[in-house]
Regions:
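C-terminal structural segments of small proteins and small subunits
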Residues: 66-93
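Short S/T/G/P-rich N-terminal loop/turn motif that feeds into the first structured element of a domain
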Residues: 1-56, 64-74, 97
Length: 97
């Protein structure tokens, strides 16, 4: 099993209200990939955070193996969600697999 963990910071230009909307969209879009991507065992996006947090959202996903993770990165459903609900709003991204 391979874990894929990402922390995102959203762009500073957004109000807190807009950031909440963006986080909801990220969570809904990414979690909807469950069952659509071969080898994706679980996927959770955490958006509830304390004021002391330095990240706006976190993804925690598990894959059967490294090949499944590589396939996820280019899977059309993932790319669609990432390009519409994540990448346009992100200032920084930190990943650990």
């Amino acid at each position: 099993m391979v874990r894929h963990i990402i922390l995102w910071q959203l762009k500073d230009a957004y109000s807190e209200e807009r950031k909440q909307e963006i986080r909801r969209g990220m969570k809904e879009g990414l979690e909807s990939l469950q069952g659509k991507v071969p080898g994706l065992l679980s996927i959770t996006v955490k958006t509830d955070r304390l004021a002391s947090s330095s990240a706006d959202a976190m993804l925690d996903a598990a894959f059967t193996d490294e090949d499944a993770l590589k396939a996820y990165r280019v899977h059309p459903e993932h790319v669609k969600v990432a390009d519409s609900r994540v990448r346009p709003f992100v200032k920084t991204r930190v990943c650990m697999d």
